[in-house]
């Protein structure tokens, strides 16, 4: 089995076989979920602070699809970057399970990945994080350097994609890449 290497939002390597699908409604053991925010409006066309740039219509549909298609059991907590597009990405999921979206500045865009990595490693199993295309690849790269492997499609870190991080012996050992809803 070849490990993946994540660079510049692109996965490279050999596809590893996926484990069998999980049964809906069961808690995914030993897993933390990293979701890249869904499709947002154009950065160049947005005239206000980038922190308030919302999801596009397609992004709103992606966020609903993430929540509607969730088959990993009830999350224990949902955290988001302070950026509106991240909050909007996981709000439908939080609503589905009766949770509030908690703001976590350590997973915000342009934050040193070491801060995000620390928060993610300390998170209890079943925690969901919404973050950005600059943070998630750095976190995953750091975990790969520590021996974590990735299974799943080599579709890259597209908006709305998710990494499911599985722990073994207290460390993240395996990661499933889940392509974004279309």
Predicted features along the sequence, with ranges:
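Low-acidity, Ser/Thr- and Arg-rich intrinsically disordered low-complexity segments
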Residues: 2-8, 16, 22
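Intrinsic disorder/low-complexity segments enriched in polar/small residues
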Residues: 10-11, 20, 61
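Long, intrinsically disordered low-complexity tandem-repeat segments
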Residues: 14-16, 26-27
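Extreme N-terminus of proteins, especially the signal/transit-peptide cleavage junction
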Residues: 22-30
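Active-site-proximal alpha-helix that buttresses catalytic centers in soluble enzyme cores
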Residues: 30-114, 137, 148-153, 157-160, ...
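A broad structural signal for short, well-ordered beta-strand segments within beta-sheet-rich domains
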Residues: 75, 172-173
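Active-site-adjacent alpha-helix immediately C-terminal to a catalytic or transition-state-stabilizing loop
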Residues: 114, 118-172
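Short, solvent-exposed aromatic-acidic interface loops
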Residues: 175-182
